[in-house]
């Protein structure tokens, strides 16, 4: 419709737009080449097992993550700086008090 309106106004512009339309239609209707079924060749596939065992949990940058649990026993009285005569800390007995 637009081509017809442009052709009515300027015959050469309508003809060049029609030629452009034909080129685009031919390019879009041309069959696309089929993609290969396997994107990665067989010689590049990774082995199923690691050749060497992991020496530790290390991320991509070589940094070992910090674990939330401390190493060794936790001294409860020295951590809270309590004395035995102060009585037990009731917040430590209920696991849902810190949530």
UniProtKB/Swiss-Prot annotation:
- Please give the subunit comment from the record: Interacts with SPPL2C (via active sites); the interaction stabilizes FREY1 protein and inhibits SPPL2C proteolytic activity. Interacts with IZUMO1; the interaction retains IZUMO1 at the endoplasmic reticulum membrane and coordinates IZUMO1 complex assembly.
UniProt topology in membrane: Single-pass type II membrane protein
* Entry GO CC: endoplasmic reticulum membrane
Originating species: Bos taurus
Q: Which Pfam families does the entry link to?
A: Frey (PF15878)
Residue numbers spanned by region Disordered: 64-90
Keywords attached to this Swiss-Prot or TrEMBL record, sorted alphabetically, are: Endoplasmic reticulum, Membrane, Transmembrane, Transmembrane helix
TM ranges: 13-29
* Entry function: Key regulator for male fertility expressed transiently in round spermatids where it recruits IZUMO1 at the endoplasmic reticulum (ER) membrane and coordinates the oolemmal binding multimeric complex (IZUMO1 complex) assembly. Upon complete assembly of the IZUMO1 complex, its ER retention is released, facilitating IZUMO1 complex export to the acrosome. Through the interaction with SPPL2C, inhibits its intramembrane protease activity directly accessing the catalytic center of an I-CLiP.
Gene Ontology annotations of biological process type: fusion of sperm to egg plasma membrane involved in single fertilization; gene expression; maintenance of protein localization in endoplasmic reticulum; protein N-linked glycosylation; protein stabilization; protein ubiquitination; protein-containing complex assembly; sperm-egg recognition
What is the protein's major site of localization? endoplasmic reticulum
Query: Per its record, how is this protein called by name?
Result: Protein Frey
**Per its UniProt entry, which superkingdom is the organism in?**
Eukaryota
Under InterPro entries, the record lists:
Frey
Q: What is the annotated localization of this protein? A: Endoplasmic reticulum membrane
What GO molecular function annotations does the UniProt record carry, in alphabetical order? protein-macromolecule adaptor activity
